[in-house]
């Protein structure tokens, strides 16, 4: 979940003096459309071969936390099968003059490794315990919002997303819930 700070609640005429509207300022920055996935693939499901599982072992990953603050550390675990270097591009989603996102950071040619599929546990829970592929501190100037990590396998150009939230713990007018875990 993320709180969006700096917006106006219904019935408010203007922002408090000198508060600035960091979301509006961020959204006015130039964006780009390269955040979209253009080459995806899914594999048949384990129960029914006619239904895609929603995952592609070519490149897939998850984050150590789904919600972080600026200054926090974030680990991203990635598996590539077959083993392949991969690129990670991190985008903040938003209006950005209609482009939908802004590129915040790129990691080129990260070494890939095939990480084991977890066993099915009690209640059909699968708990990945993969090794981190990259770890970084969230920059202090990254404002609250939904962030996409676009993963691209070098060997096949297949792509997928990891999703995380940068949150701001100040009081806010709007709460947005993002359910990215399955």
Protein language model features and the residues they cover:
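Short, solvent-exposed beta-strand-terminating loops
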Residues: 97-99, 176-182
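Extended, polar beta-sheet/loop recognition surfaces of beta-rich domains
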Residues: 156-178
